[in-house]
Amino acid sequence: MSETKNVRTLQGKVVSDKMDKTVTVLVERKVKHSLYGKIIRLSTKIHAHDENNQYGIGDVVVISESRPLSKTKSWVVSELVEKARSI
């Protein structure tokens, strides 16, 4: 009865941290066009939960799927891959 569930994870770049305890992550993926065969880049913006407001714009993070936390938020930031370079 103790089955483990595979959790979906995605990697993306933080593009907004203006909301409290929430970051907007831009996830890019490459897809082959069905008719022409050209490789194109598609992107999706996902709202993710950031409990301690510790991630900033430009950080590369890994997000994992969770239960719905609000109307638009059902992902949680799980780890930091690369910190944004400060000028």
UniProtKB/Swiss-Prot annotation:
PROSITE patterns: RIBOSOMAL_S17 (PS00056). The keyword Manganese does not apply. InterPro entries: NA-bd_OB-fold, Ribosomal_uS17, Ribosomal_uS17_bact/chlr, Ribosomal_uS17_CS. Signal peptide: none annotated. CDD domains: Ribosomal_uS17. Gene3D superfamilies: Nucleic acid-binding proteins. Coiled coil: none annotated. Keywords: Ribonucleoprotein, Ribosomal protein, RNA-binding, rRNA-binding. Pfam families: Ribosomal_S17. One of its GO terms (molecular function) is rRNA binding. Part of the 30S ribosomal subunit. Belongs to the universal ribosomal protein uS17 family. This is Small ribosomal subunit protein uS17. The gene is rpsQ.
